[in-house]
Amino acid sequence: MSDPQDRIAHVSWEEGRAANLANWEDRVPIHEVGYGVASGTIEEELSDVVTYDLAAMAPFLPGGTVDGLDLCHFQCHIGTDTVSFARAGARVTGVDFSPSALASASRLAARYGVEAAWVETDVLDAAAAVRDAVARGAAPTADFDVVYTSIGAICWLNDLDRWAAQIAAVLRPGGLFYIRDGHQAMFALDENAPDLRTVYRYFGDGSAQVWDDEGTYLGEGTVAHTRTYEWPHPLSEVVNALIGAGLRIERLDEGTVLPWQFSPRMEEIDGGYAWPGPERQRVPVTFTVVARKP
């Protein structure tokens, strides 16, 4: 698919979700090795992602910490960051659509003696699923002080209004939502071009973009289900979805350093990867939003 137009896919949410789930199921054993979960060498302290995000969240948290707070991690994958929040003192519930990922997360929590609840659901149905888990005795609470999502998350969702409604539904009054994710301005670039060249859409129109890739962002190995679908979401769509759900935006930032190597031209620096030289200041690679439920 050399032509960006060939990547446009008019698929239903159900079809796209099924393909993505198969792909993410395949990623679990690869990521267990890549993160050090399989070997037991995963860092004993906080993950790099959570270390960064906790510092960014601190000014908006009571006492500057998640200690003693109920935290729900949307799209938690194999739980490495969720377990880090538990190590920081939060009472955690992880939400993800992959049963294999949640089984891995549960094993990780047990290995380190961390208490955590895990809820299998599409994040677009998170509120009802967490309430059901509470009713079954599988989760301690359906109301949270913090809802968190970070890095490589919302591109897998087709409906941000519905996503934001789930966040608002599980937050307590005064509760905090935090997201740090890849910026759509970066995703619109050709990652293999010799310069910063926009070839994909920045704005979305409801259609997905289709990708076929046997690799993944971490670890060695290949996936059997190579096809995935992603939806572009400009920053304005993210912010307006949260406002529309009744949340108050307290902070918006854009960043130049990414926790993974989006392009082979990116340089590894302290804290992640960035474009080389003066290109670093030309386009954001991440955005961060902090919002609160009144």
Residue ranges and their predicted role:
Residues 1-40:
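N-terminal, positively charged/glycine-rich alpha-helical extensions of SAM-dependent methyltransferases
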Residues 36-69:
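Conserved alpha-helix/loop element of class I SAM-dependent methyltransferases that forms part
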Residues 69-129:
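Class I SAM-dependent methyltransferase SAM/SAH-binding core
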Residues 128-147:
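A short acidic, Gly/Pro-enriched loop at the edge of an enzyme's catalytic core
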Residues 145-161:
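A short SAM/SAH-binding and catalytic strip from SAM-dependent methyltransferases
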Residues 161-176:
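A short glycine-rich, Lys/Arg-flanked "PGG" loop and its adjoining helix->strand segment in the class I
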Residues 176-216:
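Conserved class I S-adenosyl-L-methionine
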Residues 228-252:
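Short alpha-helix
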